[in-house]
């Protein structure tokens, strides 16, 4: 059976006001061994969120047995920096044959 976990991680922000993606990964694993994780509100290069961390890369490193696919719902140019992005991250240990991103 395929196990799927979907979660709005709110950029990793906990109830204690601390951004901790390792804690998110631990909690996700405690809920079961998900083959596919669909994470909403993941940020990349936004200085207002976790000091501009690349949360996509961090989460991918925390789930090394999963492939990462990121779809930015918001993508803004930033002077002298990588694009500031905010969106959804799909982590899959199963093969992904097709992937579509639909902007709403």
Give the location of each predicted region.
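Active-site catalytic loop in hydrolytic enzyme cores
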Residues: 94-104
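Ligand-binding beta-strand-loop-alpha-helix segment within the catalytic cores
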Residues: 91
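N-terminal, active-site-proximal structural segment of metallo-dependent hydrolase catalytic domains
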Residues: 1-65, 70-86, 100
């Amino acid at each position: 059976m395929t196990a799927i976990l979907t979660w709005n991680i709110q950029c990793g922000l906990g109830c204690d006001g601390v951004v901790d993606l390792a804690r998110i990964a631990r909690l996700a694993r405690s809920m079961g061994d998900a083959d596919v994780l669909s994470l909403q509100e993941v940020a990349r290069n936004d200085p207002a969120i976790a000091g501009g961390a690349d949360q996509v890369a961090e989460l991918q490193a925390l789930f090394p047995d999963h492939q990462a696919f990121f779809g930015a719902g918001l993508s803004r140019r930033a002077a002298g920096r990588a694009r500031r992005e905010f969106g959804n991250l799909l982590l899959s240990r199963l093969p992904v044959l097709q992937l579509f991103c639909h902007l709403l």
